Swiss-Prot record:
A biological-process GO annotation: tricarboxylic acid cycle
Molecular function per GO: citrate synthase activity
EC number: 2.3.3.16
Family: Belongs to the citrate synthase family.
Signal sequence residues: none
Note: Citrate synthase is found in nearly all cells capable of oxidative metabolism.
Superkingdom of the source species: Bacteria
Name of the protein in question: Citrate synthase
Enzyme class: transferase
Coiled-coil regions listed: none
Keyword Lyase attached: no
Pathway: Carbohydrate metabolism; tricarboxylic acid cycle; isocitrate from oxaloacetate: step 1/2
Enzymatic reactions: oxaloacetate + acetyl-CoA + H2O = citrate + CoA + H(+)
Length: 20
C-alpha cells in the first residue's frame, strides 16, 4: 500500500512515503 510516515523529533518532523 501507499502510505505516509511521519517521524517526530526534537526540532521538527520529517515525512516520507512508504510502499508496502
Amino acid at each position: 500500500s501507499d502510505n505516509s510516515v511521519v517521524l517526530r523529533y526534537g526540532d521538527g518532523e520529517y515525512s516520507y512515503p512508504v510502499v508496502d
